[in-house]
Regions:
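Active-/binding-site microenvironments in catalytic and ligand-binding cores
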Residues: 1-212
Length: 212
């Protein structure tokens, strides 16, 4: 199984060993390495893009065996290679995912329990279970000040990896199990705006966007 270097490193470049490179029907290639800094699509987060050897990494996914597969636009020779994650897309993905955690924490302060989310650009939302007896959705303006306060606090990220299980939090906030990428402190999220709150069948969907 591919070593997930992004679990414990924010580096964007590294030397890796290409184990296989297989052509796909659409003309792209599926490349597997012994280890990678590339975060695959999953956990509600988009996969990283970048370069592997001389090839462009178009997206990164898991295969059925649990290996991380780099989908590239060209063949990559088996053996040593250099990889480079696209910095801009990684930062955006990390900001969006971190914002999702902070929205979950904001909701918890009002008695709502977050249990899933989608942190892709243009689709970003966090879904909460409604407190017992609550039938009316809050408004974005009700939560926005608390979210803004968490972001402005510049709380430092804390990551723990034990027996392959990874937990993340910022400052003294409660830790959650998460294998995705996040910014180093909450201020790096930047301006995050709650755009819509919809309550249906006991679930509150909170949509959000980054303003820059």
């Amino acid at each position: 199984m591919t070593e997930k270097r992004f679990f414990s490193s924010d580096d964007l470049t590294a030397a890796v060993n290409v184990l296989s490179s297989s052509p796909l029907e659409d003309g792209t290639w599926a490349v597997i390495t012994d280890a990678t800094l590339f975060h695959p699509q999953g956990g509600g987060q988009a996969g990283d893009k970048g370069r592997l050897g001389a090839a462009n990494v178009l997206k990164t996914v898991f295969n059925e065996a649990g290996d991380i597969v780099h989908i590239t636009d060209a063949d990559v020779a088996v053996g040593p290679a250099e990889e480079a994650v696209d910095a801009a897309s990684r930062l955006l993905n990390s900001r969006l995912h971190t914002a999702g955690h902070l929205i979950a924490e904001t909701g918890a302060g009002f008695g709502w329990h977050a249990y899933k989310g989608d942190h892709r650009a243009g689709e970003s939302r966090v879904v909460f279970k409604a407190p017992e007896g609550v039938t009316t959705a809050p408004q974005p303006a009700d939560w926005q000040p608390a979210l803004d306060k968490l972001i402005a606090a510049a709380l430092p990220r804390r990551v723990t990896v034990e027996n392959g299980s990874r937990s993340v939090t910022w400052g003294d906030l409660p830790a959650t199990h998460c294998g995705d990428t996040h910014v180093k402190n909450t201020s790096m999220v930047g301006a995050c705006r709650l755009t819509k709150m919809k309550l249906k069948k006991g679930e509150l969907s909170v949509s959000y966007t980054l303003d820059n």
